Amino acid sequence: MTDPLAFRVMNEIGIIDQLGSTLFERSMPRGLTLPQFVVLNHFTRVGGDRSPVELANAIQVTKATMTSTLQRLERKGFVTSAPDATDGRSKRITITASGRKARDQSIKAIAHHLAALETAIGKKQLEAVLPVLAALRIFLDRQRDGD
């Protein structure tokens, strides 16, 4: 019996995620972990500030895990935290210029792998798959949020 098409697609994406994460972790600048990069990349992609809970939900980790990651990033000067103006119990986290630089350096560190991928698969094929992947992400985001 053949597995359902959607399962096979998700299975491939999961394997790609594991392989890509391993490759990325091996190439990251010293002292930066993949979870820390993910937070920096999230800020770069969406902009603005976020609460630790908002970040934990967006990245699909526990609040405790996010708090630990944010503390490490703050010690490195990659994010800042300030009291929430509307809710004094919460904090608002913002990426710093150093955080953006660390994120950009991480991408530069894997540039040769990205170039090899583009050569092996082809720019046109990668461009063709990108809208499908974006649609999958949007669908899964809505499922996560209960829409």
PLM region spans:
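N-terminal leader segment of winged-helix/HTH proteins
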Residues: 1-30, 76
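N-terminal helix-turn-helix DNA-binding core of bacterial DNA-binding proteins
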Residues: 22-65
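C-terminal regulatory/oligomerization modules of transcriptional regulators
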Residues: 1, 123-147
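Generic structural concept
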Residues: 10-17, 96, 130-137
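Charged, amphipathic alpha-helical coiled-coil/dimerization segments
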Residues: 71-131
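N-terminal positioning helix adjacent to the helix-turn-helix/winged-helix DNA-binding module
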Residues: 5, 35-36, 51, 98, ...
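Short, locally clustered residues in the helix-turn-helix/winged-helix DNA-binding domain
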Residues: 14, 41-47, 107, 134
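DNA-binding alpha-helical recognition surfaces that contact promoter or target DNA
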Residues: 68
